Amino acid sequence: MELETQAAFDPASFEHIPVLLNECLEGLSIDPAGTYLDGTAGGAGHSRQIALRLDAEKGGRLISLDQDPDAVQTARARLAGLPATVVQINVRYAGQALESLGIDKVNGALLDLGVSSHQLDDAARGFSYRADAPLDMRMSQQGETAADLVNTESREELARILRDYGEEPFAWQIAGRIVEARENSPIETTLQLADIVASAMPPAERRKNKNPSRRTFQALRIAVNHELDALEEGLDTIFDHLAPGGRLCVITFHSLEDRLVKNKFRRWSTACTCPPEFPVCVCGGKAKAKLITRKPIEANSQELEENRRSRSAHLRVLEKC
């Protein structure tokens, strides 16, 4: 079988249907004269719709960020002629990007944390377990690959990654099988890894689980791209640069992301920080924000029918005080 290899990139090929688009636009409560940040441009679906609602003559402006060079190229093409600036940078450095453009505060910000359809569908990027390709998984296309990780880390560290980032119940068994396999030859492709993962699963689990590699691939992708660390730092720096009354909208796609965002939002929207055993508040704290959504917004039946990748999307919205 031939491996998928990466060809010259065409922005027109970057297909990504923006998830919960109308809900995000409503959540941002866009001021045509405001400054907005999209920290995860992807296919620029959300970015374009935000930019279309801004009035450049009144100072309206969008800053759109992404670490993926393909996404940046796509965003620049699709935002051409609109009041938008596209910067190639990881969201954890959003504050630096804003400051470099002379921007202190934004009136709203959006993060869509899903892997784009383009990244999943382009087998050569190594995110998918359905086609054979180099085991890559790098969003930025720089640094350590998933192949580097599975061929060098100890069984203990691999098991930790699979357990912590993939919530994989068979983490120890899969890690052991990876170590055994690489002693014979390096693990270099996605289907090699998928076969190894399947072989580590009990037969009953293989029969029950149509995609036994899903959790392992998620865990490795998160580890390779340091996604949770980047998300935590990105949330903090974006909140620091959010103007009073500004909205922060975050779309998550798995429980690890959602838990992190939920806890951040709860902390910012809680006034008292005293230990729970204190009978009365003594800290005199004030909430830094208020929750616009008490529970996450999910895709409606029409969107679920039109875009199956929206089924795990959860949108949370916060307003800074």
Language-model segments: which ranges?
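S-adenosyl-L-methionine-dependent methyltransferase catalytic core, i.e., the SAM/SAH-binding region
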Residues: 1-321
